[in-house]
Regions:
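Helical segment within the ABC ATPase nucleotide-binding domain
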Residues: 184-196
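Conserved ABC ATPase signature
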Residues: 144-149, 153
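ABC ATPase NBD Q-loop/coupling interface
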Residues: 66-83, 143
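Conserved ABC ATPase "signature" region
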Residues: 66-73, 118-139
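Conserved catalytic motifs of ABC-family nucleotide-binding domains
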Residues: 166
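Catalytic Walker B motif of ABC-type/P-loop ATPase nucleotide-binding domains
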Residues: 170-173
Length: 251
């Protein structure tokens, strides 16, 4: 047994007539790295984005079932979506730095949600850039536009920006797929260091990455939850034939 940070109950997501997630129920462990794996089009990203209600931004989407965070269903009508996305942050596949300086990218969220003084912001920006492993590379360039950074640096900047609003959960959607191997390694290292303070949920199509990072694994296929459990058990002794076939590279 473990302490769940998110509890999903009977979750369904459909885009028009196409159902992407079918009756999924699973608990996400707190302060661990949970990897969602499965072939392309299996519903991994849809499941991930449903956890912060970003899936609703797609026109025509329908969501039913429950996503419970701190015991409350995130899809209740009176839930504050802005507050949800502050507490459950998303790091996307491609970095999307804001069109402003490196410093202001990290300071943007805290400015929006609070009233920190300049000195407090400077301390916070340094703290989160260090947490993202970027401080030493940009400490003398904080007023330069974020667009001047490399793609790998931009992804770490987006990580720092996400951490600056102090989320409890960090959703990571194929966050290294557009990066060179060294940049990907740096992001992976940061995630491993951060898991003692954050609950990290990672979508990846790279099984080697899931094996390196995951404490817990969820296997999806054709929108359905096929198997979930501790990473060592799923990778070494999967219970379901479709899990075994996927891990063996048969589809």
């Amino acid at each position: 047994m473990f302490d769940p940070v998110i509890q999903i109950r009977g979750l369904n997501v459909a885009y028009g007539s196409q159902q992407a997630v079918r009756d999924v129920s699973v608990d996400i462990p707190s302060r661990q790295v949970t990897a969602i794996i499965g072939p392309s089009g299996c519903g991994k990203t849809t499941l991930l984005r449903s956890m912060c209600r970003l899936v609703e931004l797609t026109e025509g989407v329908r969501v039913w079932g429950q996503v419970l965070f701190k015991g409350r269903n995130l899809y209740e009508p009176d839930m504050d979506v802005t507050e949800i996305r502050k507490r459950i942050g998303l790091l996307a596949q491609r970095p999307f730095p804001l069109p402003m300086s490196i410093f202001e990218n990290v300071a943007y969220g805290p400015r929006l949600h609070g009233s920190l003084k300049r000195a407090e912001l400077e301390t916070l920006v340094e703290k989160e850039l260090r947490a993202a492993g970027l401080w030493d590379e940009v400490k003398d360039r904080l007023n330069e536009p974020a667009s001047a950074l490399s793609i790998g640096q931009q992804q770490r900047l987006c990580l720092a920006r996400g951490l600056a609003v102090e989320p409890e959960v960090l959703l990571c959607d194929e966050v290294t797929s557009s990066l060179d191997p060294l940049s990907a390694q740096r992001i992976e290292g940061r995630l491993l260091e951060l898991r003692s303070d954050y609950s990290i949920i990672l979508v990846t199509h790279v099984l080697r990455q899931a094996r390196r990072l995951a404490d817990y694994v969820i296997f999806m296929y054709l929108g359905e939850l096929i198997e979930h459990g501790p990473a060592e058990q799923v990778f070494k002794n999967p219970h379901q034939p479709r899990t075994r076939a996927y891990l063996a590279g048969e589809f």
